[in-house]
Amino acid sequence: MPRDETPEREHAEQQSRQALEEEVRELRRRVEEAPSRVRALEEKLLEVSGALAQTQAKNEKLTFTLQQAREHIQNLREEVEKLTQPPSAYGVYLAANQDGTADVFTTGRKMRVAVHPEIDLAAVRVGQEVVLNESFAIVSVRGSDVIGEVATVKDVLDDGSRVILLGRADEERVAQVAGHLQHPPLRVGDSVMVDPRSAMVLERLPRPEVSELALEEVPDITYHDIGGLDRQIEEIQDAVELPFLYRELFGDYRLPAPKGILLYGPPGCGKTLIAKAVANSLAKKVEQVSGRSVRSYFLNVKGPELLNKYVGETERQIRLIFQRAREKAEEGVPVIVFFDEMDSLFRTRGSGISSDMESTVVPQLLAEIDGVEALRNVIVIGASNREDLIDPAILRPGRLDVKIKIERPDEQAAREIFARYLTPEVPIDAGEVTTLGGGDAEKAIAVMIERTVERMYATSDENRFLEVTYQNGEKEILYFKDFSSGAMIENIVRRAKKLAIKREIAGGSRGICLDDLLASIAKEFKEHEDLPNTTNPDDWAKISGRKGERIVFMRILLHEEEGQTGGRAIERVATGQYL
């Protein structure tokens, strides 16, 4: 190798070595700087990731806002469409046609309109309200209208689908009956609501005046609840129950059932109780004989409330009551129409002072009882404490056939009435049970009742009540027993029970004792010292059940020992409670 090439080679190697060393140093520097660069890149990656997440959240928020805006715009469009739609008309459904159309009454005229496919006309009733669109097609079905005019059914036409109505000023018109009112059909006299535009009867209205006056409830009173009236109960059973229980036997003898019964007598002696017990007992007896469940109907007519200031209203209500009774009787069940305070409605014609109302009311009742339309399975029972005021035509045979006097209770009847209220279920004082009954509560009650009745019916000076002077100059002493009644006996027992309750509350003994009953009698007599007050002596005598010579003067004997010896003319004082 030439000598001159050696330095050049060494120089080249040196340069190459330097370059390699430089490259090594660069690589070492890069290796040393790599972790910091990695950390920087990681930090930058985190920043970019956070920015991306923020951008995504913004995008989601913008998307949600955009969706809300779209929905709001859609709602606004729907509202605008609703506001710009033409109004829907209402109509009354009349009938369906074979071609799928329907007849409706709307805007004062009858129209044949199309029906939306989703509406089933078979389920739509006549008289229902329908909604029509701008093309007068039925798009919806509603219930019947709830407002209209009130009218009264005068007559029922066809099969009950049409009726003749009486409206304002007795104007008559023919109207169609809505489908839901045709079964059961309307009856003559029913109060209904009618749509005057379509002449459609939409609703049957209750008649409060008739519903309140004639109650169809069957009372739960039995003959066992009535004490001291065994003879009267037997008479009314013979008159009412036998004709219904043995129809064939009565038919063999050609003996018609009585049409009516009059229960008369002083107030508070059980007239209304007997009438209630009749309805209850009659249904049970008929059920036993026939073997089928029978419900009797008791139409309780409150006499004074039937009176009406408008001419003909009282007569109309009497007709409605008997019409209802006939409808119930057609089912083959007994119906009792009970007129309480009968003298207030059916007074003797011509006896009115300020009106002649009775001149039309009495004939209406007579026509209902034995007119052209015979009463079958219907019994009229009247109750009154002034039977002398009732028109004689009502009391004649063939109308109110049976007349039963409900008298004031005697001593035996009083014992039976007391026994209805003083029963072993009522707490009795333990001392009385031991002393009077020897440990037997029922025996103690019997002794208490016996002594109470003896005190109540004694004709001693402490029981003297009135001295009455008759027109012929005779005088008579009346005792409290002459004015006793079942209501008075019930009130005495109530007072005794109240005394026992107050004594037990105060820490005393429990139960009723004899002293409670005796104290109650004294208090009852004390409170009724003004019992005979009346403006007319004859009225007092008749209502109290004492008939005969006219009473012209009376004086109270209850407090005579206290210096009140003077009498008082009864014309100067007000009407009393019981008499």
Swiss-Prot record:
PROSITE patterns, sorted: AAA (PS00674)
Entry GO terms, CC: proteasome complex
Protein name (record): Proteasome-associated ATPase
Region described as Docks into pockets in the proteasome alpha-ring: 578-579
GO molecular function, one term: ATP hydrolysis activity
Region Disordered, annotated ranges: 1-21
Domain of life of the source: Bacteria
Record's keyword annotation contains Chaperone: yes
SMART domains assigned: AAA
Residues annotated for ATP binding in this entry: G268, C269, G270, K271, T272, L273
Cysteines joined through disulfide linkages: none
Record's keyword terms, sorted: ATP-binding, Chaperone, Coiled coil, Nucleotide-binding, Proteasome
Assembly information from the UniProt record: Homohexamer. Assembles into a hexameric ring structure that caps the 20S proteasome core. Strongly interacts with the prokaryotic ubiquitin-like protein Pup through a hydrophobic interface; the interacting region of ARC lies in its N-terminal coiled-coil domain. There is one Pup binding site per ARC hexamer ring. Upon ATP-binding, the C-terminus of ARC interacts with the alpha-rings of the proteasome core, possibly by binding to the intersubunit pockets.
Pathway: Protein degradation; proteasomal Pup-dependent pathway
Family per record: Belongs to the AAA ATPase family.
Species whose genome carries this gene: Acidimicrobium ferrooxidans (strain DSM 10331 / JCM 15462 / NBRC 103882 / ICP)
Protein role: ATPase which is responsible for recognizing, binding, unfolding and translocation of pupylated proteins into the bacterial 20S proteasome core particle. May be essential for opening the gate of the 20S proteasome via an interaction with its C-terminus, thereby allowing substrate entry and access to the site of proteolysis. Thus, the C-termini of the proteasomal ATPase may function like a 'key in a lock' to induce gate opening and therefore regulate proteolysis.
Organism ancestry: Bacteria, Bacillati, Actinomycetota, Acidimicrobiia, Acidimicrobiales
Swiss-Prot/TrEMBL domain comment: Consists of three main regions, an N-terminal coiled-coil domain that binds to protein Pup and functions as a docking station, an interdomain involved in ARC hexamerization, and a C-terminal ATPase domain of the AAA type.
